[in-house]
C-alpha cells in the first residue's frame, strides 16, 4: 500500500475547510435574487469541490455542459435550494473526511 504524504493530508484538510466554507456562503446568500460569491475554484487544491461549484454556474453553459468558472456571481443564476446543495457538499466533505481518516490510519 502506498503511504500518503503529509502534503496529501494537508490537501485533505484544505478540502474539508473549503467545502464547508462554500456551504456557509451558499446558504448565507441562497436567495436567487442576490449575488452569490463563492471561493474561486481555481485556488490550488480546490478542484475536488469544483464540480459542485460548477453546478451552480448556470450562466456558463457550453454545448449544454457546464464549463469551468472562477466565480459564481451572476445575480440571475438559478440556484439549487440550500438543503439540496448542502447534501451535495456534505457528501463531498464526507468522502474527503473518510479519505483523510484512511490516510491518517496508514501512518499508525
Curated annotation (Swiss-Prot):
It comes from Saccharomyces cerevisiae (strain ATCC 204508 / S288c). Keywords: Glycoprotein. Glycans are attached at residue 33. This is Uncharacterized protein YJL009W. The keyword Glycoprotein applies. It comes from the Eukaryota. N-glycosylated.
